């Protein structure tokens, strides 16, 4: 890749400012790697801003951006493209009836191919990517040789800690990429991220929501916890649920309900735990937000907030 990153069709959409998600250094490293012609592997758990990082870099430099989700169904044909079967019967294997897949679209436009969940891709599909990365060209049967336009690059992302439905990434791929490790952001950065999505909620309550999500990453019963997306959803759901119930956003029961629905599917329990996700979420919630208020404590709070009888 050269430093010619001129705009073309399919420019990346706008994303959150990188300063707001504490990824300025990673953005500089990614941009420098792409400008140098290197391909990049972003490694980190879900919700650490890998997609946001790439989208913002691509948006800022107006680089064409093609997204493909890695999974077991991503065959070489789906990645490269195919001839339209109906038109083949009429016109034969003419180049103009070939429908580009995401790889050829990125190569022809000199854009970035962003591959999510790289370690879920079948080996034969991964070999196609390796060839395109190494040679900046591929040979397509009945279509011929496709050479990548200036600016083409591949950025892949994966969660190296997820062992379910994934395969070990070969050393050949690591040898062809520069690796940027992306861990969880600081508590302050995560509070800023939640603020972007729910700016009107109380700062102290928002801080507790972030503390709850961060606690899930260290709980002994959990194999892994939630990323900041869980905190974003807790805040959003609590706002709507409080309106439906006619109570304050920081109502204890509203917060618990929002936390259970937002986190129970994001956390993963150890097989030997013998507990439900909701049970663990409630335990953490009570530790951060305090025990469930009783009717007496609610009455005391109401009395404290009202003038007494003379």
What does each of the following model-derived ranges do?
Residues 1-207:
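AAA+ P-loop NTPase catalytic core and its hallmark functional loops
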Residues 19, 118, 220-227, 273:
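Generic alpha-helical structural element
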């Amino acid at each position: 890749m050269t430093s010619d990153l001129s705009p073309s069709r399919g420019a990346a959409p706008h994303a959150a400012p990188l300063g707001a998600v504490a990824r300025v250094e990673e953005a500089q490293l990614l941009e420098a790697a792409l400008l140098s012609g290197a391909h990049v592997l972003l490694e980190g758990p879900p919700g650490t801003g890998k997609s946001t990082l790439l989208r913002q870099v691509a948006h800022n430099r107006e680089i064409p951006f093609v997204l493909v989700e890695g999974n077991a169904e991503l065959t070489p044909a789906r990645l490269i493209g195919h001839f339209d079967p109906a038109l083949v019967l009429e016109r034969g294997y003419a180049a103009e009836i070939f429908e580009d897949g995401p790889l050829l679209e990125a190569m022809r436009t000199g854009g970035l191919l962003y591959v999510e969940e790289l370690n879920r891709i079948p080996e034969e599909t991964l070999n196609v990517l390796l060839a395109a990365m190494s040679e900046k060209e591929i040979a397509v049967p009945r279509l011929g040789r496709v050479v990548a336009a200036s600016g083409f690059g591949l950025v892949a992302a994966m969660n190296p800690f997820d062992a379910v439905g994934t395969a070990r990434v070969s050393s050949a791929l690591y040898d062809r990429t520069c690796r940027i490790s992306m861990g969880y952001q600081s508590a302050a950065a995560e509070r800023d991220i939640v603020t972007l999505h729910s700016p009107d909620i109380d700062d102290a309550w928002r801080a507790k929501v972030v503390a709850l999500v961060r606690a899930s990453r260290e709980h002994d019963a959990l194999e892994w916890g939630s990323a900041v997306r869980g905190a974003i959803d807790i805040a959003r759901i609590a706002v709507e649920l409080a309106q439906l119930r006619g109570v304050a956003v920081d109502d204890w029961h509203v917060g618990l309900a929002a936390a259970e629905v937002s986190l129970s599917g994001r956390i993963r329990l150890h097989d030997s735990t013998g507990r439900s996700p909701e049970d663990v979420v409630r335990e953490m919630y009570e530790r951060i937000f305090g025990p469930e208020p009783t009717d007496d404590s609610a009455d005391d709070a109401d009395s404290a907030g009202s003038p007494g009888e003379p």
